[in-house]
């Protein structure tokens, strides 16, 4: 068992961690993975069945580079492994849900004609917001679903990877 002590790169953990241990933490630094970069890039390359439809969608934008905008609200009915109900709408200061003006301010830095693809775990909420109504916005609604009815993430991830900018 080895625990990452903080959220940035820990050289001591990287250099001295024994093989065969269970790692715990977020490991958000690229420095943990630079020695296996090629293998990771290969493993995380979308196969043609996923990438081709996404590329076709991008071609419909007539060469305009889209902005990826992700709205994270969380499912108000989520239950963690301990049985506690939670969602980002209930997390307050730790994981605040961004108000619409956050997205307005972020988008003001871009050309108003640049298309925006909106991704969300709360698609119905996004559709209800007047802010996302103009033609500039396309709301991603993956067709593939898991048995429980939740959307599969791979098409959204592929589309996000093809966007030129990201607002999260």
Regions found by a protein language model. Give the residues of each.
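Secretory-pathway luminal glycosyltransferase catalytic domains
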Residues: 1-112
């Amino acid at each position: 068992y080895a625990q990452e002590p903080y959220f940035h790169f820990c050289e001591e953990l990287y250099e001295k961690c024994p093989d065969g241990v269970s790692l715990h933490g977020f490991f958000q630094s690229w420095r943990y993975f630079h020695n296996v970069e090629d293998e990771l890039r290969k493993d995380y390359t979308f196969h043609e069945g996923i990438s081709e439809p996404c590329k076709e969608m991008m071609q419909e934008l007539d060469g305009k580079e889209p902005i990826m905008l992700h709205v994270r609200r969380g499912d108000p009915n989520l239950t963690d492994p301990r049985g506690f109900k939670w969602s980002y709408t209930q997390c307050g200061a730790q994981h605040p849900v961004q108000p619409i003006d956050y997205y307005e301010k972020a988008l003001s830095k871009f050309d108003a004609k640049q298309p925006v693809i909106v991704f969300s775990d709360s698609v119905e909420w996004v559709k209800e917001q007047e802010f996302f109504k103009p033609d500039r916005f396309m709301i991603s609604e993956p067709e593939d679903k898991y048995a429980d009815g939740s959307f599969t993430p791979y098409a959204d991830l592929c589309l996000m990877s093809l966007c030129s900018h990201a607002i999260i």
